[in-house]
A protein has these predicted regions:
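Aromatic sugar-binding surface patches on proteins
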Residues: 78-93, 178-187
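Beta-strand-rich modules
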Residues: 191-221
Length: 230
């Protein structure tokens, strides 16, 4: 998901000197395309393109055209049209990475203005993390997830789900070790996770690769999941 909340400029143009005129807000949005990789049911790494467009001004619709000219309407939106994105189905993933190059976004704002944006996708992708362990401690009051570090990943984030409900979310974090550790882990008190009661919990670990060290636009993400009974 990436929903890129890039802080774009919002200009307030004051008309007249009396202060009685109405202010106009300049329409501006940020658009991002990035590669998402997962392992399918057969254990094969597959890829798709994720599109995310954000604006402080409500948008009516967003469409994107790939470097090869294929159009796609972004039908998922949140916050009254401040964010548009695509939710890929299993059939949208392929063993071949998405086409690199410039993706063109046509953004239609609620006031009728239409603006075109572009974002370029490189060829880099991330492998899904190899989760080596997900288990409760001997005392039974904590749970640890362990995984092999993903080559080239800038950071990670973790989401814990119980069915369709989010039980816990760990925002992006990075390994600050020098040198970087080959294996990583996160631990949680059980009472941090089990607000939805006992049952099957899904840990969703995502690796993040940004376009640059300004850490705003994404180039690629990868997601691995594993279940545990809590």
């Amino acid at each position: 998901m990436k929903k890129v909340h890039l802080l774009t400029l919002i200009a307030l143009i004051m008309l007249g000197l009396s202060g009685c005129e109405k202010a106009k807000v300049t329409n501006e949005a940020s658009a991002d395309v990035f590669v998402k990789s997962i392992k399918n049911a057969q254990g094969v790494t597959v890829y798709t393109a994720i599109h995310s467009v954000f604006s402080y001004n409500p948008m009516k619709s967003v469409s994107v055209t790939s470097p090869g000219g294929a159009p796609l309407q972004l039908t998922n939106f949140e916050n009254g049209g401040n964010s548009f994105f695509n939710e890929p189905a299993v059939t949208d993933y392929s063993t071949t990475a998405p086409a690199s190059g410039a993706y063109t976004y046509l953004v239609k704002f609620n006031d009728g203005e239409e603006i075109t944006y572009t974002n370029s996708l490189a060829t880099a992708a991330l492998l899904p993390a190899n989760i080596t362990s997900l288990a409760k401690t001997a005392s039974g009051d904590s749970v640890y997830i362990k995984w092999d570090a993903i080559p080239s990943s800038h950071a990670y984030q973790l989401k814990v789900m119980k069915g369709t409900k989010q039980a816990y979310y760990q925002p992006a974090f990075a390994d600050g070790s020098v040198p970087l550790k080959p294996n990583l882990r996160l631990g949680f008190r059980l009472n941090q996770l089990t607000g939805e009661g006992s049952g099957t919990y899904t840990f969703e670990l995502t690796g993040l690769l940004f376009e640059s060290t300004t850490y705003d636009y994404l180039q690629a993400i990868s997601t691995s999941t594993q279940n545990i009974e809590l």
